[in-house]
């Protein structure tokens, strides 16, 4: 084995198996690009992103950890969200929840 080398079992890896997901169209109404990370509470994203915010409460992007989605000014794209797991308590971000979902 080479230091840092990955030895991955053949086959598919399903992310967030069994969790509820939701697809939303999201538009950037601002004049700057907006990037949202994999574990950011989507409900609390930049206000220049327009979408069904209430539906996104308690959800994050359904993408691999450490990755992000970038929304260019004027761009609309469909994203898939997945429910937050664990104790379902949210602190920080934009400060809109600060406790239990």
UniProtKB/Swiss-Prot annotation:
- Which top EC class is named for this enzyme in its record? hydrolase
Q: Which PANTHER family match?
A: UREASE (PTHR33569:SF1)
Q: Which keywords accompany this UniProt record?
A: Cytoplasm, Hydrolase
Catalysis performed (reactions): urea + 2 H2O + H(+) = hydrogencarbonate + 2 NH4(+)
**Pathway it acts in?**
Nitrogen metabolism; urea degradation; CO(2) and NH(3) from urea (urease route): step 1/1
Q: Where is the signal peptide?
A: none
- Which InterPro entries does the record cross-reference, listed alphabetically? Urease_beta-like, Urease_betasu_sf, Urease_subunit
Transmembrane feature ranges: none
Q: What is its EC number?
A: 3.5.1.5
| Protein name per Swiss-Prot or TrEMBL | Urease subunit beta
Task: Report the subcellular localization.
Answer: Cytoplasm
Q: Which family does it belong to?
A: Belongs to the urease beta subunit family.
Q: What is one GO cellular-component annotation here? A: urease complex
């Amino acid at each position: 084995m080479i230091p840092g080398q990955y030895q991955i079992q053949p086959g598919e890896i399903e992310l967030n198996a069994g969790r509820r997901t939701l697809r939303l169209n999201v538009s950037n109404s601002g004049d700057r690009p907006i990037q949202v990370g994999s574990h950011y509470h989507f409900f609390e994203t930049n206000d220049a992103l327009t979408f069904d915010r209430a539906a996104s409460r308690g959800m994050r992007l359904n993408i691999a950890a450490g990755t992000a989605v970038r929304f260019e000014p004027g761009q609309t794209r469909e994203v898939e969200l997945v429910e937050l797991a664990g104790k379902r308590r949210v602190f920080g971000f934009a400060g809109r929840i600060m406790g239990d979902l």
